[in-house]
Amino acid sequence: MDLQDQVQRRIDELAGTELGLQVAVYRQGELVVDAVAGDGVTPETLYFAASTGKGASATVANVLVDRGVLDYDRPIVEIWPEFGAHGKDTATLRHVLTHSVGLPALPPGTTRKTLSEQADRLAATEPWWEPGTKMTYHAETFGVLVGEIVRRATGRTISDVLREVLNPLGIEENVFFALPGNQRHRLAQLVEPEGAEETFAMLAGMFEQVVPRAMQPRAAVVNRPELLAIEDASSAILTARGIAKLYAALIGEVDGVRLVRPEAVPVITGPALVAQDELLGNPATLALGYSIGRLGSSADESPATIGWPGMGGSVAWADTRSGVTFALTRTLFDPSGSASAIEIGNLVAKALC
């Protein structure tokens, strides 16, 4: 049984509880798994994938660095002068990409409708620490900061630049930071599992210091297309095939397209920061905009793998050693973990990595 059949059989079994799944795998630029399960789910179904989308915003930034538009170590104030308030004049894109810039908290009261106003407020905010000296996961401010840096450098929104990056790959309708009105019909309606309220409440309390409750993802919120139409580069609305292909073009060549020069790949994907998360307490090994280590394993166990998981159970990763990229999306928006993403990811890694 080939890998396509193995994955298809397993997600068909999982669809009873997961409700819907997409899995896509690229190897050396070739699509080798493209599987879906669940009522109404097709490879073109769009999923709100939460922080899995950070891989797309990081990739936009890295492409712009490779093109000479941005620089990892040039002070942000050179393109965004107001950002230097409260001693942030030494902060760089590298600090933002490694979650060490010291601005993990959205201003209190932020909602999706006011998210576009937060870049100016973050620029005026005192950092939690001197940029680059500590880190904690910038769950929602990551996208605000990367998006504004991209806008200042290019004069365009990060959504516009993302579309430019995606166009040569033919996936410009497969990864979005803001859901266009003409794509609303493709959006999957996520479902929270029964009995999950306690877990959601626990996570809300854990993140409330940095993410106001109105910005914390719940199915009732992210199932509303009008709210997903608001640009948020900390998340994405995507297909598994789209984000897997984006990662494949980052680490190698797909359909004759490379997003960055080959010599840039180890710079982008190698360890850029090893630290203890100041807020969450976990050890973190980060590349330039990505977590190192396959979901379900540590950075030491899978040091050639970069990616991001998303709350609710989606994930996308790329293994630079084997040239394999993997993505999974699902309809069940489960806050308690990503067991299916780990299981199917391990199945793929065992076969190909």
Annotate each predicted stretch with a short phrase.
Residues 1-36, 44-48, 134, 151-159, ...:
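Catalytic loop of the DD-peptidase/beta-lactamase superfamily, centered on the K-T-G motif
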Residues 132-139:
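Cytochrome P450
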Residues 57:
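Active/ligand-binding-proximal structured segments within catalytic/core domains
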Residues 43, 48-52, 64-104, 108, ...:
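Active-site helix/loop module of the DD-peptidase/beta-lactamase fold
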